[in-house]
Design a protein with these regions (language model features):
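Secretory targeting signatures
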Residues: 1-29, 640-707
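Secreted peptidase-domain scaffold signal
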Residues: 55-71, 295, 350, 508-563
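Subtilisin-like serine protease catalytic core
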Residues: 158-281, 304-309, 340, 364-367, ...
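Extracellular S/T/G-rich loop segment that most often corresponds to the catalytic His/Ser-adjacent loop
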Residues: 193-199, 363-463, 467
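Long, low-complexity serine/threonine/glycine- and acidic-rich segments characteristic of extracellular
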Residues: 530-645
Length: 707
């Protein structure tokens, strides 16, 4: 009887605690309390030149060079730092050192005869002789369509959660220069650099003794491409009269680092100069300058504008290799290095359409955020959006490292078709970097299309994410963009990832959810620098309400790209308390990338009134968290929080305990009277009342579940 009585007490005590956190009411055969067993995968540490597929016979020469005859642009990649001895040796052999790219241990030699590649491959330290690629520029509705700016169709957007619309975030627009005199780009300039002039001897460089490398030079845009792209990232929408046109970028208050790597002619390599300009070398030099200056304290600006946060690239480099780039060429690797240095890279996927032969360099970078383009049909509504006919499709060429996720490009897509452009000085008269122009009276006109124009819109979203959470790491930013994007199309490789699609990547960028996730992580003090991004835990969009009403049943899917998932948890109180989910029963052991489902339920009536966040995460064996996924729901307000539920449980518990003790005392007294009629139970001195069973504080309780 005593055992039965204790059980009743416990049931009455725990009943209120399970009001918000509960488990699905399916049979035990459908769900298990034990997470499926998983086998981890260990990626071997192998040097990139030993697995790249761009050198199939492992002779340290790009395959396309072996049959090429005549002059060709050549770069050498070393397996270590490039030393003075290396450059002196090359010069003694008659080669001109065009540039040393320290970030990827490379030397650019310019145009040489292709017959020399065999001897160059034998030099000490050289691990790859690479062919220069050719630079190609990829080039109203957009901002609200990606859910950055509010509209009647989508009132809840990224700008709802951004107090300053990107203020204090620096975007390095690496392009043909930006005319920041434009009224929508005025006062955005923080620093600039002209890689074209720095490397080459055009007439103005000869006269000026080359331009400044300290960030003080402000390039002009004699092409239009760079100004248009910066406008889509951060134009304020103002015209020369100070009136708002509505043509804002996604982060109107973000600032500009103006890095000119493109010629006025766009694709080069000539810019109507007397001497040819090699665009490839300028591109590599410009990105190296960004890495070198990622933390620079720019003179004359507030401390909040020091350094470089984002690198926006609306162009690509052809690889000349069959099947495109595998991401191991030096121009893709330098973007990896920029990412690892803390600069978030947003790069265009390319405009080669559905029949593209792989992706070009830059867009093939394993660590960058590669952006494809959608056609928004000139409507804000996203339901009618489709992949743009010109947008390059994935996957990227396999690089041979046994990691299929690297080949999943593009990462995301955004509106890139028929976009209004900010006018550069070239649109209203002659101007270039020899003859200064003025775009102060220019406006917004001329629609353009391309992954060039989708990319800066995403760069602006990234600026908003950094604004609300400055601690975000570049790879965490990429993971947030992937996980919050609107899924488009069926999974192209479901055996490796449940969502990635070869046209859309992980989906159409959702500005609101990306910025809100970034803000929420900051509010609940979840740092992303030590997150395990290999753990994939996602809610599915098929939540339902049970027959009882007010109970949401959540279903999700999970897998791992390497490490083992030890548990999956959910929280309804901002991560203060976590509850384990139920799992799909699985026979045997799951290998890497194999997925399983999970489920849990939440009683919405017992959540605080108003919006509530339901968050879910995975945990590995070291206790490290995955990126969170979430859903927002409206609570019924019948119970404020889980802590309040605990307080109610404590009151009920004390009441039950008091009643139980009284009944038990009467029962003992009666029993004693029957068996020992003259014996009385007398409490010891100083104990006039029965002590409380627990301290008067918030009860730290554990939810009891039925296995």
């Amino acid at each position: 009887m005593r055992a039965h009585f204790a059980l009743i007490c416990l049931v009455l005590f725990f009943a209120p605690l399970t009001g918000s956190l509960s488990q699905p009411e399916q049979s035990e055969s459908q769900w298990s309390s034990v997470i499926p067993t998983m086998t981890p995968v260990v990626h071997q540490e192998v040097d990139w030149w030993d697995y790249t597929t761009m050198d199939s016979n492992r002779n340290a020469i790009h395959d396309s060079l072996e049959t090429l005859q005549g002059p060709v642009g050549i770069g050498l990649s070393y397996g270590r730092d490039v030393t003075d001895i290396d450059t002196q040796l090359l010069e003694s052999l008659g080669y001109e050192i065009r540039d040393v790219i320290e970030a990827v241990d490379a030397v650019l030699l310019g145009i040489i005869d292709s017959s020399n590649v065999w001897n160059l491959s034998q030099l000490d330290g050289v691990v790859m002789v690479e062919r220069y690629g050719q630079i190609i520029l990829y080039g109203d509705i957009q901002t609200p369509n990606i859910l950055a700016e509010q509209s009647d169709v989508y009132p809840h957007t990224a700008w709802n959660h951004s107090e300053t619309l990107g203020l204090g975030v620096n975007i390095a627009m690496v392009d043909t220069g930006v005319d920041n005199e434009h009224p929508g780009l005025n006062e955005k300039f923080v620093a600039g650099y002209d890689a074209v002039c720095y490397l080459h001897t055009d007439p103005s460089c000869i006269l000026s003794g080359a331009r400044e490398t300290d960030g003080s030079f402000d390039p002009d845009d004699g092409n239009q491409h760079g100004t248009a792209c910066m406008g889509m990232a951060s134009a304020t929408g103002l015209d020369s009269n100070g009136e708002q046109t509505g043509f804002e970028g996604s982060a109107p208050n973000a600032s500009l680092i103006d890095v000119r790597i493109g010629t006025d002619a766009g694709a080069g390599p000539f810019e109507n100069y007397l001497i040819p300009q090699e665009f490839y070398e300028s591109a590599m030099n410009g990105i190296q300058w960004i890495i070198d200056n990622k933390d620079t304290a720019w003179p004359g600006v507030d401390e909040s504008l020091y350094g470089i946060d984002i690198l926006s690239l609306s162009w690509g480099i052809t690889s000349h290799e069959t099947g495109g780039s595998d991401g191991e060429d030096m121009h893709s690797r330098i973007l990896n290095e920029a990412t690892l240095a803390g600069v978030t890279v947003s790069v265009a996927a390319g405009n080669d359409g559905p029949s593209n032969d792989g992706l070009s360099g830059m867009g093939s970078s394993s660590l960058s955020i590669t952006v494809g383009a959608t056609d928004d049909m000139n409507t804000i509504e996203r339901d009618d959006d489709d992949i743009a006919s010109y947008s390059s499709r994935g996957p990227r060429r396999d690089n041979g490292d046994s990691n299929p996720i690297n080949e999943m490009k593009p990462d995301v897509t955004a509106s890139g078709s028929n976009i209004i452009q900010a006018e550069a000085c070239v649109t209203t008269g002659g101007c270039n970097n020899l003859i200064n122009g003025d775009a102060a009276d220019n406006g917004y006109t001329g629609r353009g299309s391309g992954t060039s124009y989708a990319t800066p819109a995403v760069s602006g979203i990234i600026a908003l994410m950094i604004e609300v959470n400055p601690e975000l790491e570049p790879l965490a930013i990429r993971e947030i963009l992937r996980s919050t994007s609107t899924r488009m199309g069926e999974a192209s490789q479901p055996e490796h990832d449940a969502f990635w699609n070869e046209d859309f990547g992980w989906g159409l960028v959702h500005g609101h959810d990306a910025v809100w996730t970034s803000l929420y992580l900051n509010e609940i003090n979840m740092t992303t620098s030590d997150m395990n991004l290999d753990l994939q835990v996602h809610l599915l969009p098929n939540n339902s309400t049970s027959d009882e009403g007010g109970v949401n049943i959540y279903n999700g899917i999970a897998w791992s790209r390497g490490d083992v998932l030890e548990t999956i948890e959910f929280s309804v109180d901002g991560g203060s308390t976590w509850e384990e989910v139920y799992y799909e029963p699985v026979n045997g052991t799951l290998s890497t990338y194999e997925s399983f489902e999970f489920s849990f339920s939440v009683n919405l009536d017992t959540l605080p009134a108003g919006y509530n966040m339901i968050i879910v995460r995975g945990i590995d064996s070291s206790g490290t968290s995955s990126m969170i996924d979430w859903d927002s729901v409206i609570g019924g307000g019948q119970m404020m929080t889980l802590s309040d539920a605990s307080s109610l449980g404590r009151v009920l518990f004390l009441s039950v305990v008091g009643l139980a003790v009284a009944i038990f005392g009467v029962w003992v007294f009666v029993n004693q009277k029957v068996t020992e009629p003259f014996a009385l139970i007398v409490p010891p001195e100083g104990t006039e009342e029965i002590p409380l069973a627990i301290e008067d504080g918030i009860l730290d309780a554990e939810i009891i579940k039925d296995d």
